[in-house]
């Protein structure tokens, strides 16, 4: 029966899925039910008993794209699991591309200065709970994949994976997920990410000495080590080995390669493990960075982590639908009249928010420098 179900879904969704997801003013009853501040929230779209709410600043297309993705994801799972999610009356809040998380009435904060910068940078895609209601938060630039937004994976699919886990799993599935994750830790997979830091602090058009910039950015690290890493190929410029005299500008790509194993996000805990393999089931995950290895598709997952893939199959079946970037669906359905190059804004973090992000990653990678000290037999002070 499950095969018939998914064949019918595939054949029928073109007719039954809403070609245009209707964006309406937020109603008083919606505001009461979801406890939404009508001074801020003005627009709403409902799909699969999920309410998408935003300020007036967020585009209707962002509403429609979010609704489309939710609709396809809800159709791409076993009916009983989808029904449990519907009963939770999930709330989705979209942050406008020119809004901050701290402007959402539910997520205001007393943080100030750099702490506020970090909060607004880091918290643009997450799952929370307001009372017992699952509440997902996304940024418009990530859903629509504007320039400057996330274009390498769907944050929406990842976070909705958490909704599926938290709201859709029964006790038996929870226990099975625990056992599946314990198997991951036992056999040691999802520990093959890339131990390398992108260095992005150089913003000048004019070329400057990379060694000098590195010394300034990493004052705790040995200048001798920095020189050695440049000449030995541990610090690459545009993917190439260089030397201590190299000059770079804002357009050059600098990578500090620490080497060795690196824990993937999927091996962090059972919750993130599920969200990561859920993404892969729909062919949308980043590859070969600080949190990811090479696995990003369903076919790859089946070969790499067959037990995790079987869990996905038993929860989701084998739906034909896969995530496809809205940039590649221009001209179709609700994106019929959308011109990506003309209609999508470029999103750039303010300099102080960029600094907060760079500071975070400097701290994140700090312990990995020891690998380079050991490699080159240089004592770390």
Where are each of the predicted segments found?
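Boundary at the C-terminal end of the N-terminal hydrophobic targeting segment
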Residues: 16-19
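Acidic/His-rich structured neighborhood in mature extracellular/periplasmic domains
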Residues: 21, 29, 37-40, 47-190, ...
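Active-site rim elements
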Residues: 54-57, 260-268, 295-301
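Post-HExxH zinc-binding segment in Zn-dependent metallohydrolases
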Residues: 166-195, 253, 259-286
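A basic, amphipathic helix-loop patch mediating RNA/tRNA/ribosome contacts
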Residues: 192-258
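Pan-zinc metallopeptidase signature
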Residues: 271, 276-381
């Amino acid at each position: 029966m499950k095969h018939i179900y998914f064949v019918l879904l595939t054949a029928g969704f073109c007719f039954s899925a809403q070609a245009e997801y209707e964006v309406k003013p937020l109603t008083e009853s919606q505001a009461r039910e979801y406890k939404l501040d009508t001074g801020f929230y003005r627009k709403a779209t409902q799909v699969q008993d999920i309410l998408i709410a935003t300020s007036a600043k967020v585009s209707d297309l962002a509403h429609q794209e979010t609704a489309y993705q939710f609709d396809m994801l809800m159709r791409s799972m076993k009916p009983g699991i989808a029904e449990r999610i519907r009963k939770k009356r999930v709330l989705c809040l979209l942050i406008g591309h020119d809004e901050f998380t701290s402007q959402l009435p539910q997520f205001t904060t007393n943080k100030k200065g750099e702490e506020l910068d970090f909060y607004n940078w880091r918290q643009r895609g997450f799952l929370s709970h307001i009372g017992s209601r699952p509440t997902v938060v996304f940024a418009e630039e990530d859903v629509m994949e504007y320039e400057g937004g996330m274009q390498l994976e769907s944050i929406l699919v990842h976070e909705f994976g958490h909704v599926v886990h938290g709201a859709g799993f029964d006790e038996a599935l929870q226990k099975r997920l625990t056992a599946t994750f314990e198997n991951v830790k036992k056999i040691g997979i999802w520990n093959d990410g890339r131990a390398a830091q992108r260095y992005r602090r150089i913003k000048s058009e004019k070329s400057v000495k990379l060694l000098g910039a590195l010394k300034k950015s990493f004052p705790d690290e040995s200048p001798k080590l920095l020189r050695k890493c440049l000449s030995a190929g541990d610090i690459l410029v545009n993917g190439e080995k260089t030397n201590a005299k190299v000059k770079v500008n804002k357009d050059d790509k600098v990578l500090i390669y620490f080497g060795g194993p690196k824990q993937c996000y999927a091996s962090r805990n059972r919750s993130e493990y599920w969200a990561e393999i859920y993404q892969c089931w729909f062919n949308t995950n980043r590859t070969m960075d600080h949190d990811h290895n090479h696995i990003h598709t369903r076919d790859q997952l089946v070969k790499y982590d067959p037990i995790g893939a079987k869990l996905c199959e038993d929860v989701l079946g084998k739906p034909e639908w896969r995530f496809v970037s809205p940039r590649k669906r221009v001209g179709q359905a609700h994106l019929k009249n959308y011109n990506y190059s003309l209609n999508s804004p470029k999103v750039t973090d303010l300099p102080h928010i960029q600094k907060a992000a760079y500071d975070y990653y400097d701290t994140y990678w700090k312990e990995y420098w020891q690998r380079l000290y050991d490699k080159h037999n240089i004592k770390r002070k």
